Amino acid sequence: MYEAIGHRVEDGVAEITIKLPRHRNALSVKAMQEVTDALNRAEEDDSVGAVMITGAEDAFCAGFYLREIPLDKGVAGVRDHFRIGALWWHQMIHKIIRVKRPVLAAINGVAAGGGLGISLASDMAICADSAKFVCAWHTIGIGNDTATSYSLARIVGMRRAMELMLTNRTLYPEEAKDWGLVSRVYPKDDFREVAWKVARELAAAPTHLQVMAKERFHAGWMQPVEECTEFEIQNVIASVTHPHFMPCLTEFLDGHRADRPQVELPAGV
């Protein structure tokens, strides 16, 4: 179905694998188009409860695939290529944020530039103890993109975001966890197995409630508290009229759900 990415649906999880390992899984324009299409398919597939984005072999994603830049076409050709690339990057990032499924970034290696942007746009992020994070844009002389000016400071705070961007330093897993870039760190050798376990847990949870939470948290960043609480009321009313609600309430009142977490995550390192 796809040429530039890996894709499969299993156990309610749509796995999207960025696969250009000889270039640390940098994303071509075609790959971005395919990731966006795969996200659209996941949203339309009732059997899919969660999406997992990861990278082939030992890297997550090193950003834009620079080797397809048409240097022989001069400044105008390079500019046009970056304009097209930025448009597709941003369509893909928008879809990760807006897709009506929880998205897990399973960061198995380097996440640089746009790869960092993908991890920030995802709803949850976990990483292997071999991962590393770096802004990287200034290394190649370009401004940051992939909505990092929207997401990075929101997740790690303005001071830390500016430190990462201005110094271009590499962040390693434990510090990334401490800063909130990822929620958990797992050993490299077990990472794919654990990532699939987390994704399956997300997929098994009630999709309509996951989507409500996702939409509310993103909207809440931009809205006054009064608007947030009004939408929360609407979500509560919608959720209690859903067929999922009454069995859950009955179990809870009978004492069967009081201490049961909705999604169980493996302990990290």
From Swiss-Prot:
Effect seen on changing residue 68 to T: No effect on catalytic activity
Reported impact of residue 90 to Q: Complete loss of catalytic activity. Significantly reduced activity. Substrate binding is not significantly affected. Reduced arylated intermediate formation
pH dependence: Optimum pH is 10.0. Half maximum activity remains at pH 9.0 and 11.5. Stable from pH 6.5 to 11.0, activity is lost following 10 minutes incubation at pH 4.5 or 12.0.
Result, substituting residue 34 to T: Forms inclusion bodies
Enzyme class name: hydrolase
Effect recorded for residue 67 to K: Reduces substrate CoA binding
Induction: By 4-chlorobenzoyl-CoA, 4-iodobenzoyl-CoA or 4-bromobenzoyl-CoA.
Impact noted for substituting residue 232 to D: Reduced catalytic activity, increased substrate binding
Effect upon mutating residue 46 to A: No effect on catalytic activity
Assembly notes: Homotetramer. Homotetramer, homooctamer and larger multimers. Homotrimer.
Function: Dehalogenates 4-chlorobenzoyl-CoA, 4-iodobenzoyl-CoA and 4-bromobenzoyl-CoA, but not 4-fluorobenzoyl-CoA. Inactive towards crotonyl-CoA, alpha-methylcrotonyl-CoA and beta-methylcrotonyl-CoA.
Protein name: 4-chlorobenzoyl coenzyme A dehalogenase
